[in-house]
C-alpha cells in the first residue's frame, strides 16, 4: 500500500521538489542545464564536440532520478558515492580538455561561448566531485581515553 502511494503523481512530484532543494539536487540540475546549453552552442558551431555534453547530460539525468527516487538505497551492491565521484571527476577533466581545444581553435561565436561554458562546467563538475568525494564524508570516532582495566 505504501509503495503504491509513493509511486503516485503527487508523491513523485514531492520527491522531485524535495530532492531538487538539496545541495546534490541543485548541483545535478545545474549540470543538466549547463550541459544542455553547451550542447546547443556546440550544435550551432561544431557538432563534433557535442557528444561529451550529451553523455554528461544523460548521466546527470540518470543520477538525478536515482537519487530522487532513493534507488541508491535499494541497490547497495553499487557504491554510489564512488560512482558519482568518478562521473564528476571524469566530466571535469574531459570538459577542461575539450574547452581548451575549442578555445585554441578560435571558431565562431557559438564555439567560443561553448568553450567558455565548458570551463564553467569544469568548475561545476569539479565542485561536485570535491563534495561527493567519499573519504571526505567519513567521520572518524575518537579513541576512548578512559582506562578499561580500572584505576592505576
Curated annotation (Swiss-Prot):
The chain crosses the membrane at residues 25-45, 48-68, 85-105, 112-132. Pfam families: MARVEL. Keywords: Glycoprotein, Membrane, Transmembrane, Transmembrane helix. Glycans are attached at residue 108. It is found in: Membrane. It comes from the Eukaryota. GO terms for cellular component: membrane. It is a multi-pass membrane protein. Residues 19-137 form the MARVEL domain. May play a role in cell differentiation in the intestinal epithelium. This is Proteolipid protein 2. The gene is PLP2.
